[in-house]
Structures are given as C-alpha cells and as structure tokens.
Amino acid sequence: MKFASKKNNQKNSSKNDERYRELDNLVQEGNGSRLGGGSCLGKCAHVFKLIFKEIKDNIFIYILSIIYLSVCVMNKIFAKRTLNKIGNYSFVTSETHNFICMIMFFIVYSLFGNKKGNSKERHRSFNLQFFAISMLDACSVILAFIGLTRTTGNIQSFVLQLSIPINMFFCFLILRYRYHLYNYLGAVIIVVTIALVEMKLSFETQEENSIIFNLVLISALIPVCFSNMTREIVFKKYKIDILRLNAMVSFFQLFTSCLILPVYTLPFLKQLHLPYNEIWTNIKNGFACLFLGRNTVVENCGLGMAKLCDDCDGAWKTFALFSFFNICDNLITSYIIDKFSTMTYTIVSCIQGPAIAIAYYFKFLAGDVVREPRLLDFVTLFGYLFGSIIYRVGNIILERKKMRNEENEDSEGELTNVDSIITQ
C-alpha cells in the first residue's frame, strides 16, 4: 500500500512539475523579451499566454466559481423578494426553510450518500461538530440581525468584504495557513477599493447609521469564519459526506433558530420589533400568509411605518425559488470548502457584492427591487477582479515553492535509501 501511494504521489508531483515547468518557461520567455526590448505586441501576447495557461490548468475552479456566483446572485435576489412579500414573518420563513433543507438533504443522502461512506465516517458520531456549526451559524444570524438594523446598505456591502482579512487571520492562527506578500496585497486591493466606493455612497444617502451597530455586524463574521473552518476540518480530516453534513446541520438549525425569537422583542428593531405577547399570533399569521396567501397586515403599514405591508399572494412561489437556490448555495459552498479551502471560498464569495448590485439592474431578475445602473458598481467589480488576480499570483508562487520542497524531500529520501543499500 505504501508503495502504491508513493507511486501515486510521484505521478501527481510529476504532473504538477510539468505544469509549473511550463509556467516557468513562459515567465522566462517574458523576461527574455523584456531584456531584448521586445515589442509591446509581443509582451501583450506573452501576458495572454500566461492567462490562458492559468485558466486551462484551473478550468474546473473557474467554472465552479461562475456557477456559484450565478446561484448566489439568484439566492440573494429571491431572499430580497421574499422579504418584500412576507418580511413580517422572518421566524416562520427561517424555520420552514430549515425544515425543507433537512428533508431534501436527508432524501438525497439516503439515495446517493450511503454508498460513499468510509470507515472514518461510519464509526464516528459527528453530532458535536454538527451542533457546533449550527450554533455558530445561529450566533452569526443573531449578531447580523441586530447589526443590520442601524447599518446602511452600502456599509453592509463593505462589511461583507471584511470577511477576507478576518478569515485570513483565523485561518493563519488555527489552520496554520501561510500567505505570500501577493496574497496580502490582493486582499488589501479588494477591501480598500470596496471601502472607498461604499464610503462615498454612504455619504450620498441619508439613512440612519450607527458605528456601534456596524461593529456588531462586523462581529457576525467571526462565527461564520469558525463555522467554515469547522466544516473544512470535518471534510479534510474525516472525509465526511457533504449531503450528510448539510442534512444534520439543517436538523440542528431547527432548534438553534429558536434562539432568535427573544431577539425580535428588542425595541430598536423598528419594523421587525415583536412584543412577547404577539409572538404566537405572528407565527400563525406567518403560516397563513406563506401557505394560504392570506394578508393580515394591510393598514398603517409600509415604508417608514411600524410594520411592512403583507403581500402574500403567490408568496410560496417566491419562497420556493429562494429555498431552491439557497440549498444549491449551501451544497456548492460545502463542495468548495471540501475540495479547496475556506480561503478559496471566501475569495470566491466576495464577488457576490458587486455582482448582486449589477444583477439588480435587470427587471427580469430583480422584479420589484430593480434599480438604475451606477458607474461605481463597475469600479467595485474591477477592483475585486484585479485584487483576485494578485491574490491568485501569490497562491501560484506558494504552490511552486511547496512543489520544490516536496521534490527536495523526495530526492533526499532517495539518497538516504541509496546510502543504506551501499552500507549494507
């Protein structure tokens, strides 16, 4: 078995060596053309060669990123449309969605997941890890729920991008990730670009904003980071099935979501505020709205008033589409963390901010929440793409360095074996 695994490792390393050797040759060609005073056209052709080589070698992750981005954009748009229709019943929609997720994941897992079970997964209970992920997600939702009440839309978008440095810090501290200077530079470019754009937009709006609630919203990113790291540890160490993890996490979230109920009674929640004596009535009205299409809140409601107006007609269709895209979002997120890493998911997910902003330009996607195009959204998108390219360059350098270290270790091991044979 050791011989077979060693043979596979050598095969994989030789394949990677070939990739990086080609990359080195392209880089050296570029250096030669610069030293020889090559034409501008030749330099551009060389850059396009490097880009084509990178895309060809990592085509799967790029296709997966595009699929994830599409699903994520649709998830956020239908979440917004669901909120506009039945925003008075957040607890009902949350619990119903968790129940649907649990049923769907368990059905699919029972049909397809059991065949993939391994010995580590079969002989160990992961209930503690599942519960920990659910609790971390619940803590994140509660903090975000409070923080969003006094955080403007532009600041919300900026806070989302802060997940990059927060994840980098905790992954370095706990998972022992190591970064190149270009990783830090790329992350800074993404965060600073979006910070400048969103700060400018925040000055143009007159919405209520509070630094304390902004900090509460930022703190919501920490449990999300630990939740994703727990997923990565479970995936990488125990090779647990993605469907099983999502099914069990959804099961525990049915109970951990109940922790949010007392939060609704906080008086500063404005339209989401719900007194204790109205909780049960709100739940009954929520189910009537979602499944029967019956409006309850129709008077003294609307923008800037104590309550949102119900728009329950066809709400179940919008909610069903939201649930579908959210389930797909969860599956792809887990897959990216499983096959790649928490940081890969973080970098990929941060493009959703500018992408969602642009998606709201199209009425067939956004529906009633459509808005006019803004130049600053495209500036944000460009900043993200440029920062991501720089970040990826740092990863390539680290991968090449890792391959060289493995080569040196293999060659040292072979020399040791030869020496031992000679001495015998």
UniProtKB/Swiss-Prot annotation:
What's known about how it's activated or inhibited? Transporter activity is trans-stimulated by host-derived peptides containing 4-11 amino acids. Trans-stimulation by hemoglobin-derived peptide VDPVNF is pH-dependent and sodium-independent. Saquinavir trans-stimulates transport of hemoglobin-derived peptide VDPVNF. Protons are non-competitive inhibitors of chloroquine transport.
Q: Does the keyword Magnesium apply?
A: no
Instruction: Give, from the UniProt record, the effect of changing A220S.
Output: In chloroquine resistance type 1
Membrane-side (Vacuolar) residue stretches: 80-90, 149-154, 200-209, 270-317, 368-377
What Pfam families has UniProt attached to this entry?
CRT-like
List the ranges whose topology is Cytoplasmic. 1-58, 112-127, 176-178, 231-248, 339-346, 399-424
> Which residues are listed as membrane-spanning?
59-79, 91-111, 128-148, 155-175, 179-199, 210-230, 249-269, 318-338, 347-367, 378-398
UniProt site positions, description: pH sensor, predicted to act as a hydrogen acceptor for interactions that may accelerate progression through the transport cycle. Not involved in the proton transfer pathway: E207
Phenotype upon changing N84A: Modestly decreases pH sensitivity of chloroquine transport
Q: Quote the annotated effect of S163R.
A: May repel chloroquine from moving through the channel, leading to higher chloroquine accumulation at its site of action
One Gene Ontology term of the molecular function aspect: xenobiotic transmembrane transporter activity
Q: What is its main location?
A: membrane
Q: Does the keyword Cytoplasm apply?
A: no
Record keywords, A-Z: Amino-acid transport, Disulfide bond, Glycoprotein, Ion transport, Iron, Iron transport, Membrane, Transmembrane, Transmembrane helix, Transport, Vacuole
Q: Which residues form the signal peptide?
A: none
**Reaction catalyzed:** L-arginine(in) = L-arginine(out); L-lysine(in) = L-lysine(out); L-histidine(out) = L-histidine(in); histamine(out) = histamine(in)
* Outcome following mutation: D329N: Decreases transport activity for chloroquine at pH 6.0
Q: Which GO terms describe its cellular component?
A: vacuolar membrane
Q: Which residue spans adopt a coiled-coil conformation according to this UniProt entry? A: none
> What more does the record tell us?
Can function as a drug transporter. Can transport chloroquine, quinidine and verapamil. Drug-resistance-conferring mutations reduce capacities for the transport of the natural substrates. Active transport requires a directed pH gradient and a membrane potential. The CRT protein from Dd2 strain can transport lumefantrine or mefloquine.
- State the PANTHER family in the record: PROTEIN CLT2, CHLOROPLASTIC
Q: How does it assemble?
A: Monomer.
Q: Which family does it belong to?
A: Belongs to the CRT-like transporter family.
Annotated protein name in UniProt: Chloroquine resistance transporter
